[in-house]
C-alpha cells in the first residue's frame, strides 16, 4: 500500500505536491519509495523497513522543497520559474492550501504526530534559489520522472575524487538515483569477504542502492556466495579473460590485446562473453565491448549471427543488459534484439571521474527502442 502526504492542496486533492510513504520493497512500482517527491524526485532506495516507525520532515521554504528521513536528506528540489509538467501532473506546483494524507490501497495507517511550523519567509532569498534551479524545459531527467519511468544510474563508482557525500548531493541535485558499486577482485580495493562486510556496514545507511562490480574471472572463488547476497545486486563484464594462447587479456589495454586476425579475435570475444554469461551475477555491463581499433567498426563486427548468439545466451542466463554511458554501447540493433527476447535493462555511467553521466545515451536508446518501466531491472534492495 502506498500512502501519500499532499501539501498545498485543495479540498478535492487535485493540486499540490505529493510525498510518498511506501516501505514495501516488493511493490511492483519500486521507484516511488518513502520520501519521494512523487513524479518530480522519485526515490528508488528504501530507507526504512516495513512496520518500522520513522520520522519524516518536509520543509517548504520559498521555491525549495526538502525531505528528510530520520534526519537524513533524501530530496532537495527547487521549483524553477518554468517547471516541466505533463498534463497528468499539471497541478503539482507550489501555491497555498491545506494538507492531506491519502492511501491508494487497503490497510491501516499509523501516524503518531503531525506538527506544522511556519517559516519566516523574510529570510528566504528566492532569487538565489531560482539561480540554483535546473532548467526543466531542457532536462531529460525530470521528463523521466514525469512519465513514471524509474530514474536510476545502476553503475556509479566512488573514484577520481568522488566521495559519498558529493555523490549524494549530486544525486539530489540532478534527480538521478545512484547505485554505488566498489570494484571487487584480485588487485582491486576490495579483495575478501571481511572487506565487503566492512564496506557494506559503512554504506548501508547511505542514500544509495549498493551494487558490486565483480572483477576478473577469479572473483567467483575470491568471495563467498553468502557475502555476495549482501549486495543489492552483482554485475560483471567480459573485459578480462585468457585468450586462445592462455595470455591474460584486458580488452581496454592495447598492450594486452594481441589481434592477429580480427575476425578470429571477434569470434573469441563472443565466446568469452557467452562464457561470462554463465557466471552468477545479475547484470552484464560494459556490454559487447570491442578493443581499439576494432571499436571503430562496432556494427561491422557485431554481425547478425554474432548478435543472435549473444542475445540467445543473455536471455537464457536471465541477466539484465546494461546500456553503458562511458562507451555508448551496445548499439540499437542489439538492444532491440534483447528487448524482443525479454531481457531486462539497466542504465550505467561507469564513471572514471567525479562527473557522473546525465544518462544521455541511455535515454536516447530508451526512446529509439521503446523501452518502458517494465523493461527495467528491479534491484533487490536490502536495508
Regions found by a protein language model. Name each.
Residues 134-147, 298-383:
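Charged catalytic cores and adjacent phosphate/nucleic-acid-binding surfaces used
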Residues 155, 234, 286, 321, ...:
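Conserved, mostly hydrophobic/aromatic
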Residues 4-137:
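Carbohydrate-interacting regions of secretory-pathway proteins
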Residues 29-32, 189-190, 243-247, 355-359:
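Short, charged, surface-exposed secondary-structure boundary motifs
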Residues 192-316, 371:
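Extended substrate/RNA-proximal surfaces in nucleic-acid metabolism proteins
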Residues 119, 184, 239, 289, ...:
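Flexible loop residues that form catalytic
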Residues 135-218, 291-300, 309-310, 348, ...:
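An N-terminally biased module of ancient metal coordination in phosphate/nucleic-acid-related enzymes
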Amino acid at each position: 500500500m502506498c500512502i501519500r502526504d499532499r501539501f498545498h492542496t485543495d479540498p478535492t486533492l487535485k493540486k499540490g505536491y505529493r510525498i510518498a510513504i511506501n516501505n514495501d520493497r516488493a511493490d511492483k512500482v519500486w521507484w516511488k519509495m518513502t520520501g519521494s517527491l512523487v513524479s518530480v524526485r522519485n526515490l528508488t532506495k528504501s530507507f526504512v523497513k516495513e512496520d518500522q516507525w520513522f520520522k519524516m520532515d518536509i520543509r517548504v521554504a520559498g521555491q525549495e522543497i526538502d525531505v528528510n528521513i530520520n534526519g537524513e536528506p533524501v530530496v532537495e528540489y527547487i521549483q524553477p520559474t518554468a517547471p516541466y509538467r505533463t498534463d497528468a501532473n499539471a497541478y503539482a506546483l507550489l501555491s497555498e492550501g491545506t494538507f492531506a494524507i491519502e492511501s491508494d490501497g487497503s490497510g491501516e495507517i499509523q501516524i503518531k504526530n503531525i506538527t506544522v511550523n511556519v517559516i519566516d519567509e523574510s529570510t528566504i532569498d528566492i532569487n538565489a534559489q531560482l539561480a540554483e534551479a535546473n532548467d526543466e524545459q531542457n532536462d531529460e531527467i525530470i521528463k523521466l520522472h514525469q512519465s513514471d519511468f524509474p530514474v536510476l544510474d545502476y553503475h556509479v563508482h566512488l573514484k577520481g575524487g568522488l566521495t559519498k557525500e558529493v555523490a549524494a548531493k549530486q544525486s539530489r541535485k540532478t534527480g538521478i538515483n545512484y547505485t554505488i558499486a566498489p570494484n571487487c577482485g584480485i588487485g582491486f580495493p576490495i579483495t575478501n569477504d571481511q572487506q565487503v562486510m566492512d564496506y557494506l556496514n559503512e554504506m548501508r545507511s547511505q542514500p544509495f542502492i549498493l551494487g558490486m562490480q565483480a572483477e576478473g574471472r577469479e572473483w567467483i572463488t575470491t568471495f563467498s556466495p553468502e557475502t555476495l547476497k549482501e549486495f543489492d545486486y552483482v554485475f560483471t563484464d567480459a573485459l578480462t579473460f585468457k585468450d586462445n594462447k592462455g595470455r591474460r587479456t584486458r580488452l581496454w589495454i592495447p598492450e594486452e590485446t594481441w589481434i592477429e586476425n580480427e575476425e578470429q579475435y571477434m569470434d573469441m570475444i563472443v565466446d568469452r562473453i557467452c562464457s561470462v554469461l554463465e557466471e552468477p551475477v545479475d547484470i552484464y555491463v560494459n556490454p559487447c565491448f570491442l578493443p581499439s581499433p576494432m571499436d571503430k567498426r562496432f556494427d561491422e563486427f557485431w554481425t547478425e549471427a554474432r548478435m543472435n548468439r549473444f542475445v540467445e545466451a543473455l536471455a537464457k542466463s536471465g541477466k539484465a543488459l546494461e546500456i553503458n554511458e562511458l562507451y555508448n554501447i551496445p548499439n540499437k540493433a542489439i538492444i532491440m534484439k534483447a528487448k524482443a527476447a525479454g531481457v531486462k535493462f539497466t542504465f550505467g555511467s561507469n564513471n572514471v571521474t567525479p562527473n557522473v553521466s546525465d544518462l544521455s545515451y541511455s535515454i536516447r536508446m530508451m526512446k529509439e527502442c521503446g523501452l518502458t518501466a517494465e523493461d527495467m531491472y528491479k534491484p533487490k534492495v536490502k536495508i
